[in-house]
UniProtKB/Swiss-Prot annotation:
Annotated InterPro entries: CTU2, Rossmann-like_a/b/a_fold
GO biological processes: protein urmylation; tRNA thio-modification; tRNA wobble position uridine thiolation; tRNA wobble uridine modification
Keywords tagged on the record: Cytoplasm, Phosphoprotein, tRNA processing
Family: Belongs to the CTU2/NCS2 family.
Pathway listed: tRNA modification; 5-methoxycarbonylmethyl-2-thiouridine-tRNA biosynthesis
A GO CC annotation given for this chain: cytosol
Protein name per its UniProtKB record: Cytoplasmic tRNA 2-thiolation protein 2
Keyword Metal-binding in record: no
Length: 493
């Protein structure tokens, strides 16, 4: 088989087959790179961010771009590789000048910190050092996921009244004696893997957005493929967060954080690419070596003709053990080679959505996920739900009720009622308007009501956070990054 994009006089052997077209390695790399660069130049705002602007002395001629890099995600790594090639081209064409600089941000946990250090050192040496010898184009930052809790001066305890779904909260100051950790939150409050996955995703996204807000970036480049975006869209619908889809995909408006306008826009440069195409690019460019899950990456579906791989049956989870995100991921991974039009249809349809009209008296954002709230979910749930129990009457019912009270479930409910009464009493005595007017989006309310132990959750107050306080490397040479990398975990350097 020959490449269909090479010139007729010199066709190379085809190595990739995607969208019913055959490519050689070189043509496929160009195909993927062109798709990404097209998105980076999608409108005037982004064109001005990424192109080289003359004169160089003009204020704002060099844009600041934040690129969140996950070393377990092929999309963000491929995106970084293509951005690196673009910057290299600009230095050659414009006398060592570039139109933008890139700050790479990696969020790490205690479990993967050592391997992240190792992979980042290799990535820096191979992909970033060359450009930084010319100019300070790349900066690398690391944030411990626990900084989400460490850098908040106040936390709120949210609890749901199961009689009317009203949300109450109690705020308290944080000091060294009561600092929370991700491990504690997930272990103490989450009842299933879906709730753990949701909270981890929210925390990482908020860390990245806070970092962008506090450091004045012009754009955040997310490495989501068309497949990944479709997965997120369906997951949002399933979780009761469908109203967030339009805001999530919005690349035209500036973002908001805690009802404050930000100076950056969100961009998805990989949104025209399927995940199998990204995995194929990763293999061709030999980028898998930089990921922390190399073995898992090597068996992911791709569109390479000679090296197609599928996960073995022994590695597949049972559906009942999967999170919502994993179920949607499996569905789209299974269909993308043969029915990629379904994926593109999901994304095209979602792109046409607009934000719902708000019925709120004033703009409000969810205190957990920071999404916009358009209607009060507590009122709606209270109207459609019967929550009053049938009274205990017979001797048998009283006996069974007593048994339930003595069980772990009954004791847990007793603890919930005591905590609810305590927080409600505190809320009635509080003069804090925010505490008396707490709002959660429908999705987070359902999460709290069904997947969080005792229907209560301790969460940092967003307006008291300072993410940059402990982010490593602020304008340091790349050669010094790893030496200055502070690990916020016991037993690690």
């Amino acid at each position: 088989m020959e490449c269909q994009r090479c010139s007729a006089s010199a066709r190379n052997p085809a190595t990739v087959e995607s969208r019913k077209e055959k490519f050689c390695d070189e043509c496929f790399i160009k195909f993927v790179s062109t798709k990404q660069r097209k998105q980076m130049m999608k409108d005037e705002y982004f064109r001005n961010l990424f192109k080289v602007i003359y004169p160089f002395e003009k204020e704002g001629s060099v844009s600041k771009i934040l690129l969140p890099l996950s070393l377990s995600d092929s999309g963000s790594l491929v995106m970084l590789d293509i951005v690196h090639d673009l910057l290299l081209e600009q230095t050659k064409q414009h006398n060592n000048r570039t139109g933008f600089t890139v700050d790479v941000l990696t969020v790490f946990t205690e479990e993967n910190v050592s391997v992240i250090k190792e992979r980042m050192e290799s990535l820096i040496n191979e992909k970033m050092s060359q450009l930084n010898k010319i100019s300070n184009i790349f900066n690398v930052h690391f944030i411990d996921v626990n900084e989400f809790f460490n850098n908040a001066s106040e936390v709120s305890t949210f609890i749901i009244d199961n009689e009317n779904f009203e949300i109450f909260s109690k705020s308290k100051s944080v000091d060294d004696s009561n600092i929370l950790t991700l491990k504690e939150i997930l272990g103490k409050y989450c009842l299933n893997s879906s709730s753990r996955s949701d909270l981890i995703s929210i925390i990482k996204t908020q860390l990245i957005k806070h970092f962008a807000y506090e450091n004045g970036y012009n754009a955040i480049m997310w490495g989501h493929s068309m497949t990944k975006l479709s997965e997120v869209i369906i997951s949002l619908v399933v979780k009761g967060k469908g109203s967030q889809i339009a805001t999530f995909l919005d690349s035209e408006s500036f973002d908001t954080l805690n009802n404050k306008p930000c100076k950056y826009k969100n961009l998805y440069p990989m949104k025209d690419l399927l995940s199998v195409e990204i995995e194929s690019f990763l293999q061709i460019r030999n980028l898998a070596q930089f990921l922390i899950n190399v073995e898992e990456t090597n068996v992911k579906p791709n569109c390479l003709i000679a090296r197609k791989s599928l996960p073995s049956l022994g590695q597949q989870k049972l559906v009942k053990n999967m999170t919502i995100n994993e179920i949607t991921n499996k569905y789209f991974q299974d269909i993308q080679n043969d029915y990629s039009n379904i994926i593109s249809t999901v994304l095209r349809t979602a792109d046409k959505l607009t934000q719902p009209k708000s019925s709120m008296a004033k703009p409000s954002q969810c205190q957990i996920c920071q999404s916009k709230i358009y209607t009060n979910p507590s009122n709606w749930l209270n109207r459609i739900t019967v929550t009053s129990p049938y009274p205990v009457e017979t001797t048998e019912e009283k006996y069974l009720f007593k048994q339930w009270q003595d069980s772990k479930l009954g004791q847990s409910h007793t603890h919930y009622v005591e905590l609810l009464n305590e927080i409600k009493q505190g809320a009635s005595n509080s003069l804090d308007v925010e505490d008396s007017d707490v709002k959660l989006c429908y999705g987070c309310l359902i999460l709290l009501n069904t997947s969080i132990k005792d229907k209560n959750l301790v969460w940092p107050k967003v307006d008291t956070m300072d993410i940059t306080a402990n982010a490593t490397n602020k304008n340091k040479e790349l050669s010094q990054i790893l030496d200055q990398f502070e690990i916020n975990s016991d037993g690690e350097e």
